[in-house]
Amino acid sequence: MATLAIVLFGKSFAEETKSPKSELMGGRFLTFNTIVRVKQIEVTRATSHGPDESEIHTPAEARFFRETIDKAWPGAKITWAFSWLALHDERQSYRELRELVVTYKKKFGDEITFIPGAYFSNMYNSREQVNRDLHEGLKRVSEIVGGGYRPKSVVAGFLSADNLKYLAEVEGIHVCQGNIWSQYAVDNGDGEGSICYPYYPSREHFCKPAQNEKDLIDCVNLDGWTVDFLAARIAGSKKVNDERWRSRQGVGPIETLLDMGTERGLEAMFAATSSHFDDGFKRNGFAWVTSGWEMCLVEGRKIYGYGGRNGMEGLEQWLTGIRKRWPDAKLITQGEFGELWRAHYKNNDAINYQFVHRGCGIRASEADKEIRWFMNKDFRLALLRDWKANSEEQVIDFTRYDEPAQEPADPEDGKKSRNWSLMNRINQKGTRPQDQPKRLNELLDKDQELIRKKYPELFGK
């Protein structure tokens, strides 16, 4: 299979993977991917859950969607990911839809790629089957686009370490949206425990940053949705004062524009965006926001209601607002951004992501709360406090990556392997007895020692 990939795609693939001209550091980057599918959740080639969405996957929706983005952000480049069924559906509407998206690659420079298993491929398929899906799905993308085209990345939701290794070593693809940061008790699978900015994954677990050269998989692992750091603490969702507090509240439309309406939804989206493009940029030297905006949402109200909303007005205002507030921001494809990061970081040794976020006052983003995140190769650490009351910080997450980790086995026939999370010391979701918040100096001595080596300032004098 490795030889096949090289023979079929060698020349054009080399052309497609030239290093990006721009640089990572000093940049603000937005990546934006959209999913084209037939059924709501296509977990295997033959099995799907949820409604048939084919009536809202037509050239009309795609054209309106892409023209809205171009109007708001001329020069923007986005990533389109086709499901297995959408790649192979021979109805006229899907043939025309595929042809239209190919023109967007030529016109705008968009990326066209494949998504296996509706974000949840490993929850329903063996690793071997996922590799087959990746190979044949990517081959089909190349056939549709023509000219020896190969995408720089894959959209996958969650993807196991073995499959990430396969992408890098056999398919020659070194960027994958392979984790959904903080997702737990939402939809069809859990994968809580990673860091939220790019990293090289470990061969042990896709959520774990590689610890050394032998452990490193050369496939940059990207988050799928930027979420509000305070909302992310919730396991799934909960009702508070007759409102639904949702853990995925951030820059995606379902939890914002479609749930709250345009005005309030935009406020929540900009709060999550500014956390990275303002304070995060200063702390980390670059900033990244990413959104997954499924194509079905253009007219999803026809199937799912959404209070009659489609979110497109909000999308245009969000993109226009980003350009106005951060005029240096770039909207590039997921593959380009991942390769940009890969060109700068050769391993995880220098990773030291830090974020400080105060709530915007919308639902789970509580206005009196401040959260600080520290993320590196060895661990992630989250400290929470009531900043208005000037309360003492509490550790709500401490996940060690320097300890062994193991992914679940392949799902048994006809069954699902739902939880692929990496949790050890304390987890932000608070689902286990050991997850009770505690002061930094109440952690185990060896845990304090590890943190002190990285961030001595957290312990005072």
Residue ranges and their predicted role:
Residues D386-G460:
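Acidic-aromatic substrate-binding/catalytic surfaces of carbohydrate-active enzymes
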Residues G10-A14:
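Boundary at the C-terminal end of the N-terminal hydrophobic targeting segment
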Residues A76, A81-F158, I217-G252, R283-K302, ...:
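Metal-dependent polysaccharide deacetylase catalytic core of the NodB/CE4 family, i.e.
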Residues E16-V102, I254, L258-D259, G285-T290, ...:
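Active-site beta->alpha N-cap acidic-glycine motif
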Residues R342-D386:
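Surface beta-strand/loop "capping" patches
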Residues M1-V7:
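Bacterial N-terminal signal peptides
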Residues E16-S19, K152-K282, R358-R363:
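Active-site-adjacent pocket scaffolds in enzyme catalytic domains
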Residues P51-E67, Q92-V101, E128-L138, M260-F277, ...:
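Well-ordered, non-membrane alpha-helical segments in soluble/globular domains
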